Design a protein with these regions (language model features):
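A short acidic, Gly/Pro-enriched loop at the edge of an enzyme's catalytic core
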Residues: 88-99
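A short glycine-rich, Lys/Arg-flanked "PGG" loop and its adjoining helix->strand segment in the class I
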Residues: 114-126
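Conserved S-adenosyl-L-methionine
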Residues: 165-176
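Acceptor-substrate binding/catalytic loop of class I
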Residues: 139-155, 179-180
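Conserved class I S-adenosyl-L-methionine
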Residues: 1-35, 37-46
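Class I SAM-dependent methyltransferase SAM/SAH-binding core
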Residues: 47-89
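Conserved beta-strand signature within the Rossmann-like core of class I S-adenosyl-L-methionine
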Residues: 127-134
């Protein structure tokens, strides 16, 4: 089963487990770098929780996800269509003030991540910002019928080098540690500006 198949099959359960997750600190840190009413690409929108938050704060949001069932959940929640796209199929150009990739790029294989980062770089306006989070670690692993490509401060560096300038990088506790927890039970969070 691929990670996308997992989300398609378990979308309702995933919704219940994540819709009320407290990510206010992440929002606050990210939005410090996003202009008011700016345009945000919610890359890997999942159940739509984050898209709804940004829309309610006055931002223009384009949600995308590789899981058709997640796209349906997001579309129903926010009252507008989310796009059914894999990260590898994102081809926007100079359109976004920011990209929010919360707990989503962690399913992109290491050998494809640089290409996705290049697409994100192209999608952002000059000086646009990227937020991304990964399970904390340094290796690929299988958990709960999904594949995870964990990152730490050193392993993320070559994927953003020459594309993004790190503004903030921090480790945070995994508040849902029973859900495919990393061995370290932590997340790597990155906010970086397009170079």
């Amino acid at each position: 089963m691929s990670s996308i198949d997992y989300y398609d099959k378990n979308s309702k359960d995933f919704y219940e487990r994540t819709i009320n997750a407290d990510v206010q600190d992440l929002y606050r840190r990210f939005l410090n770098y996003v202009p008011k009413q700016g345009r945000i690409l919610d890359a890997g929108c999942g159940v739509g929780r984050d898209s709804l938050f940004f829309l309610n704060k006055g931002y223009e949001v384009i949600p995308v996800d590789g899981s058709l069932e997640m796209v349906k959940l997001t579309s129903n929640l926010i009252g507008k269509d989310a796009l059914h796209l894999l990260f590898q199929d994102i081809h926007f150009s100079n359109e976004f003030d920011a990209i929010w990739a919360n707990a989503s790029l962690l399913h992109v294989p290491y050998d494809e991540l640089r290409g996705v980062m290049e697409s994100f770089h192209k999608a952002l306006l000059p000086s646009g910002v990227l937020y991304a989070s990964f399970k904390y670690g340094t290796f690929m692993r299988h958990a709960d019928d999904r594949v995870f490509f964990d990152m730490d401060e050193a392993t993320i560096a070559p994927y953003i080098k020459g594309l993004f300038l790190p503004l903030e990088m921090w480790k945070s506790a995994d508040t849902r540690s029973t859900v495919a927890a990393s061995p370290d039970k932590s997340w790597l969070n990155v906010i970086a500006r397009r170079i």
